[in-house]
Amino acid sequence: MNDFEQGNIHYMAKEYHEASECYRRFLQQEPNNYVVWHNLGITLSQLGQDIEALKCFELPCQHNYVESWLSRGTALRSLGQYREALITFAHTFALDPKHSTAYSNYGNTLREFGLPELAIPFLKIAQELTPGNVNYELNESVSHLMKGDLIEGWKKYEARWYYQSDISLKPQLPGPEYDGSQDIVGKKVLVYYEQGFGDSVQFIRFAKVLKDKGAEVTIITKPQLYDLFKYNLPELTVLNADAQIPPYHYHVALMDLPKCFNTAIDTIPYPTPYLDVDEGMKQFWKIKLGPKTKKRIGLLSSPNKIAFISRFRRIELEQLLSITSDDYEFVSLSYEVDEQILETLAKYNVKTFHEDLSGFYNTAGLISQMDLVISIDTVIPHLSGAMGVPTWVMLTDYGSDWRWFMNRNDSPFYNCMKLFRQTNGSWEPVLETIKQELKQFG
């Protein structure tokens, strides 16, 4: 077995470091083998080394190796070089007009580039070339949602359960699934969580609509959200994810409820606030924060766990802290910090209470004492928005989540929210705008 074959085995086992070493050794013997250069390139992309991967694709692209053109476009897209990625994907389906992945990637890049309406035709072509591909269906669904066509977007949103999987990851529960057509007066409906914390906070309002329709509702939620939902949904039964499931007539996923109710952008239920904390929690934080002499502003810079897309969302802490001044009392809302972060926060006189933020109910208590929250796209603005606390969200110009829609500085989900969008890939103009608005806020 040669190094090329051994590298392929490592790659299939997701042992990317070992695979790259094998490919490099093989290329020392056959430096013009463009197929091996391609394999090294896709391996480096898996390791997050997209710039190095682009160099590997040069030789196979010169040979018009279609998969290298596709992989080159994917690497460019990962780097946020959307214009170059579009050109590369277009070259891919010019070489192979039936390459459905090239059309899908072209459409996805258009959507991330802020052009979801242009993305949809290419995503439809991908589905025509490969019928039944649920990832292509999900891409089309998200494009409709991003441009604000919620009714159309919900139709194929079921495909999310197949994201990066060949089988549905949807929980297989016994009994019928609620789809909005059944009479649920007096019926027991089980609602179970999915996706991230922000999704649960944003969409929990739809569970209350079930109650309004006469159902007895049980919510299954993540432990970190249990106390928050338990307090705010006294008319519903709230259970932890590990609790024994009680009898029910119907079950439904939380984020399927908007489809069940034919929710459009102008019929989103329960305007904020719909979440709060009890007086005891508020009093705890009043004492913890001490006497109030200035308006308080809560800050959050970057997600605690950095995922692929978060490289575009995040902002360096010191960048965000450039908006601080002596005119306000600034408070960090992050619950995961290290010594370096603590030193930086202290340098800018930002208070931190990370040791007291053990769950979202505690975090909500701290947020309840803020006059304003400024954050990038994480669970925090969803939480503060649901509480009715004035919230300013900083968004990238490319790659933003669909729920912030397009070309608007407000949110139909939260009437207390203002959106600050990049226009040139830089946070500096956004931060400058926020500095000016803070002068008026006081």
Which residue ranges define each predicted feature?
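Alpha-helical solenoid repeat scaffolds of the TPR/TPR-like class and their adjacent stem/linker regions
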Residues: M1-L372, D377-G442
